């Protein structure tokens, strides 16, 4: 599993996805990210993600993003866990 620090992320690398719930994301936004709650992402990844693009997943503490990164990586997606 690929892991990078948030400080090393740059927008040209791929899409930064904040997988926290919408309330947490709105109260404490992560600069440069789009919010897709992890449950929604896991239920709809086939229609929401493109296997030819890079995605960087981030959450509050790193546990959920690590878990979701592993799952999506298993299904062949180019995903990286982002830690703060």
Where would I find each of the regions flagged by the language model?
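Alpha-helical elements of the RecA-like P-loop NTPase motor core of helicases
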Residues: 26-27, 43, 66-70
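Structural signal for short hydrophobic segments within the conserved structured cores
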Residues: 15, 34-36, 80
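Catalytic cysteine-centered active loop of the rhodanese-like fold, especially the PTP/DSP P-loop
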Residues: 48-84
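Generic alpha-helical hydrophobic packing signal
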Residues: 3, 42-45, 84
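Helix-loop module immediately N-terminal to the HCX5R catalytic loop
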Residues: 32-56
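A short helix-to-beta-strand connector/capping loop
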Residues: 12, 31-32, 77
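Flexible, polar/low-complexity N-terminal or interdomain linker segments that lie immediately upstream
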Residues: 1-28, 38
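Short amphipathic alpha-helical segments and helix-helix/interface helices
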Residues: 6-10, 46, 69
């Amino acid at each position: 599993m690929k892991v990078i620090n948030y400080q090393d992320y740059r927008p040209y690398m791929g899409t930064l996805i904040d997988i926290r719930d919408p309330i947490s994301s709105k109260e404490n936004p992560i600069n440069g990210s789009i919010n897709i709650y992890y449950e929604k992402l896991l239920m709809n990844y086939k229609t929401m993600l493109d296997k030819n693009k890079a995605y960087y997943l981030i959450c509050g503490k790193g546990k959920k993003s690590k878990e979701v990164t592993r799952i999506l990586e298993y299904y062949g997606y180019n995903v990286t866990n982002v830690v703060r």
